[in-house]
Swiss-Prot record:
Substrate binds at R71, G72, G73, Q74, V75, T76, Y77, H78, S138, L139, G140, G151, L152, A153. The active site is at C169 (acyl-thioester intermediate). The record marks K135 as: Lowers pKa of active site Cys. The gene is lipB. Pathway: Protein modification; protein lipoylation via endogenous pathway; protein N(6)-(lipoyl)lysine from octanoyl-[acyl-carrier-protein]: step 1/2. The keyword Transferase applies. Catalyzes the transfer of endogenously produced octanoic acid from octanoyl-acyl-carrier-protein onto the lipoyl domains of lipoate-dependent enzymes. Lipoyl-ACP can also act as a substrate although octanoyl-ACP is likely to be the physiological substrate. GO terms for cellular component: cytoplasm. It comes from Shewanella pealeana (strain ATCC 700345 / ANG-SQ1). It is found in: Cytoplasm. Its EC number is 2.3.1.181. InterPro entries: aa-tRNA-synth_II/BPL/LPL, BPL_LPL_catalytic, Octanoyltransferase, Octanoyltransferase_CS. This is Octanoyltransferase.
Length: 219
């Protein structure tokens, strides 16, 4: 039974594909009684190519796997030291439109960075969050049956060199930046704790229930 809470799942370090398939499974099997969940994870190195992605934007993947996925957007990189957050929300029940959800997610990142005196902003024509024209967070969602999956990636303290092997989000020469360079949160755990606060505030959901690991049936 839906309990009007936001269930936060702390997944730790996980490979991309197992988490992707688990969130597909969760979304496909939801009904009006399913909980709204947010999954927090750090992925092993991977390039993911969204539905709008073009192969020419993957310049030189080397030994990092490339996975074609069912989210919006183009190619991005996930790796250790990056906070990845997947909001699995019934947006119909929350009475939130898709564009509104994107705005809530972007604003929650902006509000979180503001706590560290970092001035970040969104761009109308290029989803994500930016600081001084450099990208600090990427965003790519999918809506199925009125429910969201996939989500956001915030660069915290990571090896940024793999971004040079792609045109991030399809933009040649797009410069990336991370929290550590700016005096922001120094660990994925710190960033995750802060972002859950600002994201739940943006969504108007103040009852939080924390869990460790994937739902049992999806492990």
């Amino acid at each position: 039974m839906y309990d009007n809470a936001l269930h936060i799942r702390h997944l730790g370090k996980q490979d991309y594909e197992s988490v992707w398939h688990a969130m597909q499974h969760y979304t496909d099997n939801r009904d009006e009684n399913s909980q709204d969940e947010i999954w927090i994870v750090e992925h092993t190195p991977v390039f993911t190519q969204g539905q709008a992605g073009k192969s020419e934007h993957i310049l030189n993947p080397g030994d990092i796997p490339v996975i074609q996925v069912d989210r919006g957007g183009q190619v991005t990189y996930h790796g250790p030291g990056q906070l990845v957050v997947y909001p699995l929300l019934d947006i119909k029940r929350l009475k939130v439109g898709v564009r509104q959800l994107v705005t809530h997610i972007e604003q929650s990142i902006i509000n979180m960075l503001k706590r560290y005196q970092i001035e970040a902003y969104a761009k109308a024509d290029a989803p994500g969050v930016y600081v001084e024209e450099r990208k600090i967070a990427s965003l790519g969602l999918r809506i199925r049956k009125g429910c969201s999956f996939h989500g956001l990636a915030l660069n915290v303290d990571m090896d940024m060199s793999p971004f040079q092997r792609i045109n991030p989000c399809g933009y040649a020469g797009m410069e990336m930046i991370q929290c550590k360079q700016l005096g922001g949160p120094q660990t994925v755990e710190e960033a995750g704790a802060q972002l859950i606060e600002t994201l739940s505030q943006e969504l108007g959901l103040d009852k939080l229930v924390h869990h460790q690991g994937l739902p049992e049936s999806y492990e």
